[in-house]
């Protein structure tokens, strides 16, 4: 019997053309302003935006047809359906990769944003992860006009020199090296003059396209993606807020001897211009540079994980874009290197109750406490998907005995469980989780990618997260200004010292349980045991233990310095 002719449903056809036409026209009218002296430039930008929108519509329409036609008639839980779905995912990801490369700008940032979403199909994340946010720099005449508009017509008098050749150019801004009258080297981040208009145009198009897909396929609940992305890029356009974020992060790590955060020069900072202290360095995953300066990549990776573990579990204030280009390694300083943290445009402040619950979740994951993991998953809203939290964060199943790895049998069980999950399960899971959880997932995915490139053990992440989760669970959130006042801070300091001591004991207890869990005869598990043994007795040896205990007693001076 010949196959039935394929009739593309009318709902699919009308949805794509009606909603995307609405997206383009509304974006056009929203940005029209014929009375502006720059009306001609705006008109050209709008035409360019419509061309970009047309490419996006074409890519989405082709993808919808591909999914509809390729999966038609296949039983949802069959091996053929899964195999075909993977093929369609890959074709669609490659289609969107071409779209992002053609449209550049915010489409590249959107592709990178999607690639960092850990729970999306791997075909999308692996394909789109190749995107690079690099563009050809604008002529300095254009940049000079932005500087004059923001810093005044005589802005050049504030500098000894400004290098007209940018040291970096991305989709939103480019950066120039300069020297102040005082001799201080600075980096000037200058926003492109047309970028805000383009952002509104592109994000509006992305939102309407996502609405189109949600209408066609109600089971795919990914409308949160463009909304989250739009909020993220919108915050990136406010350089004043970026400066405030930078200062708050610097305050949080004021006692850290390894982390460097550029100082902000407020008298030369506006919404479109950010002037900051200039640092040199190389990307954190540049292994050739680390070898050249004689620094062990494992030490660098550990410092990176400690930095972000403290952000997540203790401060609850997280840098939202920790890709290697935003974290430089600079020679000198403690242990022979320092970490320079750049680009503070996007931060996430965690709800305090969520932060405490997430600390407990990580403790439960480390201890393989399945009951507590399921209970906390229910609190987060994961429901039946709570059993997959260990897979997401530790790469083990809810039934795994050890957090350091899985047996061959457990791997087979996990493989079968994951086979039963459908694409709509992923979208339902992501929609049900709180925004704080999604933010941590994204940051954690970027960090894991970096340490994987550095070729260091994933146990560094596991142990570091566990250490700070335990501390963050017990550590009281102290107001830094209150702590700086003499006499009034004594109670808080004593309480913090006691809780720090208790958390140290609990951390050692968890480490020992992980160590015992890795105590068996297989070569791979013996290797895990040796690594953990080294971590416990070499990294946290007797001298360091005394240091920790002394730190607990004298936390008054470490956390709450008197003025």
Region locations from a protein language model:
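Helix-rich C-lobe and terminal helical cap/extension of kinase-like folds
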Residues: 86, 90, 117, 227, ...
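Conserved beta3 strand of the Hanks-type protein kinase catalytic N-lobe
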Residues: 178-179, 322
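Hydrophobic residue at the +6 position relative to the catalytic HRD Asp in the kinase catalytic loop
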Residues: 325-329
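Conserved beta3-strand ATP-binding lysine motif
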Residues: 189-191
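ATP-dependent phospho-/nucleotidyl transfer catalytic cores
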Residues: 129-136, 148, 196-204, 211-318, ...
């Amino acid at each position: 019997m010949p196959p039935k002719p394929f009739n593309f449903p009318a709902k699919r056809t009308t949805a794509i053309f009606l909603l995307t036409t609405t997206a383009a026209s509304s974006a056009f009218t929203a940005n029209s302003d014929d009375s502006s002296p720059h009306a001609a430039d705006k008109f050209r930008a709008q035409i360019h935006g419509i061309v970009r929108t047309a490419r996006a519509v074409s890519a989405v329409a082709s993808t919808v047809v591909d999914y509809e036609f390729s999966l038609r008639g296949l039983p949802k839980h069959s091996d053929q359906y899964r195999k075909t779905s993977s093929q369609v995912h890959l074709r669609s990801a490659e289609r969107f990769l071409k779209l992002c490369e053609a449209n550049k700008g915010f489409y590249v940032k959107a592709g990178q944003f999607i690639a960092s979403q850990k729970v999306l199909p791997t075909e999308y994340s692996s394909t789109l992860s190749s995107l690079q946010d690099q563009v050809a720099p604008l002529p300095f005449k254009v940049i000079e006009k932005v500087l004059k508009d923001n810093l005044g017509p005589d802005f050049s008098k504030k500098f000894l020199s400004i290098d007209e050749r940018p040291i970096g150019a991305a989709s939103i801004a480019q950066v120039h090296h300069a020297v102040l009258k005082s001799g201080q080297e600075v980096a000037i981040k200058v926003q492109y003059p047309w970028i805000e208009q383009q952002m509104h145009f592109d994000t509006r198009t992305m939102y309407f396209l996502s609405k189109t897909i949600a209408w066609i396929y109600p089971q795919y609940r990914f409308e949160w993606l463009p909304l989250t992305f739009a909020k993220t890029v919108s915050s990136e356009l406010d350089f004043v807020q970026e400066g405030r974020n930078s200062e708050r992060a610097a305050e949080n790590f004021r006692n850290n001897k390894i982390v460097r955060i550029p100082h902000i020069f407020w008298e030369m900072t506006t919404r479109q211009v950010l002037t900051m202290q200039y640092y040199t360095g190389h990307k954190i995953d540049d292994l050739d540079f680390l070898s050249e300066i004689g620094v062990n990549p494992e030490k660098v990776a550990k410092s990176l994980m400690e930095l972000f573990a403290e952000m997540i579990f203790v401060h609850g204030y997280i840098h939202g874009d920790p890709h290697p280009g935003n974290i430089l390694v600079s020679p000198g300083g403690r242990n022979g290197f320092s970490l320079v943290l750049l680009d503070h445009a996007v931060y996430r402040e965690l709800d305090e109750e969520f932060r405490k619950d997430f600390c407990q979740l990580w403790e439960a994951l480390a201890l393989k406490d399945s009951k507590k993991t399921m209970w906390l998953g229910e609190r987060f809203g994961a429901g039946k998907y709570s059993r997959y939290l260990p897979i997401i964060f530790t790469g083990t199943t809810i039934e795994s005995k050890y957090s350091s790895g899985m047996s061959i049998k457990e791997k087979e069980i996990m493989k079968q469980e994951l086979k039963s999950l459908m694409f709509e399960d992923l979208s339902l899971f992501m929609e049900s989780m709180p925004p704080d959880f999604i933010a941590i997932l994204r940051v954690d995915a970027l960090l894991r990618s970096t340490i994987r490139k550095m070729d260091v053990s994933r146990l560094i992440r596991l142990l570091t997260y566990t250490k700070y989760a335990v501390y963050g669970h017990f550590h009281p959130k102290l107001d830094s200004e209150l702590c700086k006042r003499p006499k009034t801070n004594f109670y808080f300091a004593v309480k913090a010292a006691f809780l720090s001591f208790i958390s140290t004991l609990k951390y050692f207890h968890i480490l020992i349980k992980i160590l015992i869990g890795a105590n068996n005869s297989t070569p791979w598990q013996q290797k895990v045991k040796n690594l953990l043994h080294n971590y416990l007795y070499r990294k946290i040896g007797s001298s360091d233990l005394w240091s920790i205990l002394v730190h607990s007693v004298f936390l008054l001076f470490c956390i709450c310095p008197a003025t």
